[in-house]
Structures are given as C-alpha cells and as structure tokens.
Swiss-Prot record:
Residues 1-23 form the signal peptide. Cecropins have lytic and antibacterial activity against several Gram-positive and Gram-negative bacteria. The modification Arginine amide is found at R62. One of its GO terms (cellular component) is extracellular space. InterPro entries: Cecropin (IPR000875), Cecropin_insect (IPR020400). PANTHER family: CECROPIN-A1-RELATED. The gene is Cec1. This is Cecropin-1/3. It is found in: Secreted.
Length: 63
C-alpha cells in the first residue's frame, strides 16, 4: 500500500515536470478546445435569442 502511494507521488511529480516543459503542444490543444467552447456558447446564446423572438411572434399571433 505504501509503495502504491509513493509510485503515484513520483508519477505525479514526473507528469508535472514533463508537462511544464512540453506545454507548447498542450497549450495549442487547450486553445482549440477553448475556441470550440466559445463558438458553442455564442451559438447557444444566438439560438436562445431566436427562440425567444419566435415565442414572442407566436404569442402575438395568438392574441
């Protein structure tokens, strides 16, 4: 059980140290994911606005 904790700790330290030196490609992937998220957010906001307008038109048409 102790070996398992030590192994996880060493693996975590290695991952952090290697991750900092190899951050270039990881940062690019993160930026792409962030951009996709922004586009999704903007499309959702736009879709909600259109749906609200359609609901207003439907309510006006009903009287």
């Amino acid at each position: 059980m102790n070996f398992y904790k030590v192994f996880i700790f060493v693996a975590l330290i290695l991952a952090i140290s290697l991750g900092q030196s190899e951050a270039g490609w990881l940062k690019k992937i993160g930026k792409k994911i962030e951009r996709i998220g922004q586009h999704t957010r903007d499309a959702t906001i736009q879709g909600l606005g259109i749906a609200q307008q359609a609901a207003n038109v439907a309510a006006t048409a009903r009287g």
